[in-house]
Structures are given as C-alpha cells and as structure tokens.
C-alpha cells in the first residue's frame, strides 16, 4: 500500500498519513484545522522493505484502511532538568 505523508509547521514531529496524495476527505475537518496546512513530505510504500522510523508499517496501514488516515504524534522529549530535580528531592 502506497501512502502520502504530510507534516505540519505547528508541531515538530507530527505527521499525517493518508492513502492518496491530496485526498483529505477521510480526515476529520477538526483535525485538519488543528493540523494546519499539510506540507507534503513523500510517498511511502507501507508494504515495501523499508520501515518507518517512528511508527509500525502494519499499524499505519491498518489505521489508514479503517479510518482513512493515521496521525503520528511527536515523541515526548525527556525533561532532564525535571528528572534531576526529582532525583535530588528524593535523595537528600
């Protein structure tokens, strides 16, 4: 299955996967509104040899078939300062 991948300027690491390039009919309007203007990144073969970096190819393919799209959320970044504060608080 070939899919089109789009990114947004609003949130680093957030990507929208749809079955056909430019066909956003199955994406809820509220999601498109919060996503902003989609910026095309590439076409990707989910059934091919290459794997997505931050998502499972089979999961993405299944979500696109069921819902018409897949939304990849950005990974949460570690807050090292907060971790250090918690460590110091509990190890006085």
Swiss-Prot record:
<feature type="domain" description="YcgL">
    <location>
        <begin position="1"/>
        <end position="85"/>
    </location>
</feature>
<protein>
    <recommendedName>
        <fullName>YcgL domain-containing protein HSM_1274</fullName>
    </recommendedName>
</protein>
<dbReference type="Pfam" id="PF05166">
    <property type="entry name" value="YcgL"/>
</dbReference>
<dbReference type="InterPro" id="IPR038068">
    <property type="entry name" value="YcgL-like_sf"/>
</dbReference>
<dbReference type="InterPro" id="IPR027354">
    <property type="entry name" value="YcgL_dom"/>
</dbReference>
